[in-house]
Amino acid sequence: MAMASASSSSSSISVIIFLLLAPLCLSREPPSQIPNGTLDLSLLWYGQFTPTQKERVHDFIESLNFDAKEGLDPKVSAWWKVVESYQERFEVKDIYRQKKSNRTVAPRIKVKVVRSYVDEKMKYGKELTMGNGEKLVETAIGNMSKVVPVVLLSAQVRAHGVGFCDGTCQHNALAKIKGQKEPRRYIMVSNPEVECPGECAWPFHTADKGPRGMTYQPASGEVGADALVIQLATGLADLATNPDLTKSLFKSETTPYNDDVKKNHESSSMYIVDPATKCTRVFGSGAFPGFTGRIRVDPITGGAFNSHGINHLKFLIPSIWDPKTKSCWTPM
């Protein structure tokens, strides 16, 4: 009996220690189901951003659902439809069947910004930590109950200490918010042009690792603006496709091009390869390490792009894993 009691006590202590040390802000425990319907975003601009950077992010988000006949192809919305197609494979499969047909149709995920808040003075400091990261998520949520908080960090904020600049400058995760029963899903991205452009601003800046390849001019004219879009697109795609489901989907498949990301997580049982992360640094067909793949260059501005959005704007967006073809889907 004494031995059993000691064992039970030891187990309890282990659990308590685990709970105390487990980071809340960067938890990778996934949500229970794929979001569908409307994805309401609440943006927190933390630090100082240029007008171009803010406009670029808003224009990209608005372009996700812009699939009108007018405008040039390929469109950003075609990329977002690949994200939406993940719903055909899982829980919603039997719900969205076309009338008089057995063919399933993925419901649209409408994305819109419902709140935009600016903190240029950086209330919680210029260095991101586990503690103030959680506070930033709370600030982005405000008093809204059904939004996805998106925290955008300016180039003045140092985020390397929480895992940014290590192959990526974004993450989507769950944060436990004070006063709420369920943890909240959120996205956090940073402008890498000062802290680590070689990690997160390629192909607009020379890569720090691997083949350097060719660099291009950003379509907006600002490296920070277009790098933010790439990071935000990655976070949105990975969040909207539900990591819990994609983990099993990719279990027996190889990960193209992102060996560095995989090596950094080899010791973690929680490592999840998300759809956009799986195709990191792939922007067009025929891509290989150091080469973006097939993209276009605007003959007037010299800006690189692979898709079009609202008002004929040009964007360079990351490739995304297509579960139907089991390959990286690219606009070109």
Curated annotation (Swiss-Prot):
Residues bearing carbohydrate: 36, 102, 143
Signal peptide start-end: 1-27
Cellular compartments annotated: Secreted; Secreted, Extracellular space; Secreted, Extracellular space, Apoplast
Transmembrane segments: none
GO CC annotation terms, alphabetical: apoplast
Assigned keywords, A-Z: Apoplast, Glycoprotein, Secreted, Signal
Protease listed as a keyword: no
InterPro entries from the UniProt entry: EXORDIUM-like
Highest rank taxon of the organism: Eukaryota
Metal-binding found in the keyword field: no
Family: Belongs to the EXORDIUM family.
Function: May play a role in a brassinosteroid-dependent regulation of growth and development.
Name assigned to this protein: Protein EXORDIUM-like 6
